Amino acid sequence: MKLNELRDNPGATKPRKRVGRGPGSGMGKTGGRGIKGQKSRSGVAIKGFEGGQMPLYQRLPKRGFNMRNRKKFAVVNLGLIQKFIEAGKLDAGQPITEDALLASGLIRRKLDGVRVLAKGEITTKIDLTVTGASKSAIDAVEKAGGSVAVTSAQAAA
């Protein structure tokens, strides 16, 4: 077999349809778009427009709201903290603060604080000082012999 003998399987590719190339092509003049109207013009149809029928996004009820002054936390899981300790990027002997997490590269920015969640396992005894932590994360750290100091009461829940 040579490179110039390579071919697609018969029927694997369809020939391109050249529309608007005269009546003999079967797709001449209007090119399969029908006559006049918004959809016959160039440009795409309006997104969400359903031909005058009440669109889906308007048929469904409005729900919820966005809190204007919502606090955003950098989320850290216990499994990742353990991984960074094993890799030597975090020192378990020192108290682990938000600044230590930032310096180690575990979080990119502090935002409104750091919140620790319990995904993964922690086996090393650590002393955490963070803005918030889930109850299960606090339990897991204390079970490993460590302690968690939560600096903000709102974020603890």
Curated annotation (Swiss-Prot):
Lineage: Bacteria, Pseudomonadati, Pseudomonadota, Alphaproteobacteria, Rhodobacterales
PANTHER family found in the cross-reference section: 50S RIBOSOMAL PROTEIN L15, LARGE RIBOSOMAL SUBUNIT PROTEIN UL15M
UniProt xrefs under InterPro entries: Ribosomal_uL15, Ribosomal_uL15/eL18, Ribosomal_uL15/eL18_sf, Ribosomal_uL15_bac-type, Ribosomal_uL15_CS
PROSITE patterns linked: RIBOSOMAL_L15
Single annotated GO MF: rRNA binding
Subunit structure: Part of the 50S ribosomal subunit.
Family from the record: Belongs to the universal ribosomal protein uL15 family.
Chain intervals with Gly residues compositional bias: 21-35
Region Disordered, residue ranges: 1-41
Any Gene Ontology CC annotation: cytosolic large ribosomal subunit
Protein name: Large ribosomal subunit protein uL15
Gene field: rplO
Keywords of the record: Ribonucleoprotein, Ribosomal protein, RNA-binding, rRNA-binding
NCBIfam families with a match to the protein in the record: rplO_bact
Species assigned in the record: Dinoroseobacter shibae (strain DSM 16493 / NCIMB 14021 / DFL 12)
